[in-house]
Curated annotation (Swiss-Prot):
Its EC number is 1.-.-.-. It comes from the Bacteria. GO terms for cellular component: cytosol. The keyword NAD applies. This is Putative NAD(P)H nitroreductase SERP2086. Signal peptide: none annotated. GO terms for biological process: 2,4,6-trinitrotoluene catabolic process.
């Protein structure tokens, strides 16, 4: 195995779901900006980037979230940086958001936009994404997990620990963030949380996964 391959595999062995971070150790701005940048640069279906990253450093807000986040009790207290990843709602070709992407970000020629819109519509219909608001949201939420994985992997390559978290009361946390003016529920929902920092102690057990033969099939 060459050095680059070994570095990647070592990072995946290093990464584990860190339940408690060392509160005295803080991630440098340079390192955390790199982690955020890998989220921003992540791929998404149709290139629509249906996400928003909220870095919660405010202790009072963390405490409010803790009351309804059973899976983040120690992480909210100890993480150097704590991120909420929002998924955008109702991402279809003709929304203001997608129109802004096409014209303002991707700079499509005006004459090509109708064909792009038709491509988006056809894909979302054939893949049953556009069946209802829930299927649209679930599709957007799936995209956020690509960014989440890339952020955790880049963190591991930097020697930084992380923990993805779904263990929270969705309705209560949504209410808190809405009341705080952090979350516009017309535009976004909470997809997942993730804490970053440096482990308080080493994991008690090594990483255990299924064997390759159990989960990988080759068709040649």
């Amino acid at each position: 195995m060459n050095q680059m391959n070994q570095t990647i595999i070592d990072a995946f062995h290093f990464r584990h779901a860190t339940k408690e971070f060392d509160p005295t150790k803080k991630i440098s701005d340079e390192d955390f900006n790199t982690i955020l940048e890998t989220g921003r640069l992540s791929p998404s279906s149709l290139g629509l980037e249906p996400w928003h990253f909220v870095v919660v450093q405010n202790k009072e807000l963390r405490e409010k979230l803790k009351a309804y986040s059973w899976g983040a009790q120690k992480q909210l207290d100890t993480a150097s940086h704590f991120v909420l990843i929002f998924a955008r709602k109702n991402v279809t070709a003709h929304t203001d958001y997608v129109q802004h992407l096409l014209r303002g970000v991707k700079k499509y020629e005006e004459s090509t936009i109708p064909a792009v819109e038709n491509k988006f519509d056809d894909f979302q219909e054939s893949f049953h994404i556009a069946d209802n608001e829930r299927t649209l949201y679930d599709w957007a939420s799936k995209q956020t997990y690509i960014a989440l994985a890339n952020m955790m992997t880049s963190a591991a390559l930097l020697g930084i620990d992380s923990c993805p978290i779904e263990g929270f009361d969705l309705d209560k946390v949504t209410e808190i963030l809405s009341d705080e003016g952090v979350l516009d529920t017309e535009q976004f929902g909470i997809s997942v949380m993730v804490g970053f920092g440096y482990r308080a102690q080493e994991p008690k057990h090594g990483k255990v996964r299924q064997n390759e033969d159990d989960i990988i099939s080759w068709i040649e």
